[in-house]
Amino acid sequence: MYETKAIMTTDVVVVNPDTPLDQVVDLLVAHDITGIPVVDHENRLVGIVTEKNILGALSVQEGICGTAEAFMTRDVVSFDENDDVIAICECLVNNHFRRVPILSHGKLVGIISRRDLIRYILEPIGTRRVVHHTVRH
């Protein structure tokens, strides 16, 4: 019913393992996002830095110093671009994370967040409401 490729955000903000943590924070704030995938020089996913990781860094040190690699989550749940959207939805419902990276041949090609799924699922409902409203009046 729903295609992963149609739902995922393809213009993904990413960082490298050696990106300074203060720059990661700047990107989170500037793009109003809650997590940034960490990729290597071949665009392979090696981790993710989330707001939770940043708070963890702040709890053990004063200020924001270090690199993305030092504070990233290494075991990241990801999906292939051809995986079923229902499986992705179930994963986001049953786990604490808010987004999942989408891979193709092991390389990052997109990301799907809870917000992306809600927006995509509700879009047809909004269209039906407009049509229904127009027909009624």
Where are these regions (language model features)?
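Short beta-to-alpha loop/turn elements within the nucleotide-binding domains of ABC transporters
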Residues: 2, 19, 49, 66, ...
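Bateman (tandem CBS) regulatory domains
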Residues: 2-12, 66-76
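Conserved protein kinase catalytic domain
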Residues: 8, 25, 46, 55, ...
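The conserved cystathionine-beta-synthase
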Residues: 14-32, 39, 79-96, 103, ...
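A glycine-centered beta-loop-beta connector
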Residues: 28-31, 36-52, 92, 100-116
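Cytosolic regulatory modules rich in charged/polar residues
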Residues: 84, 107-137
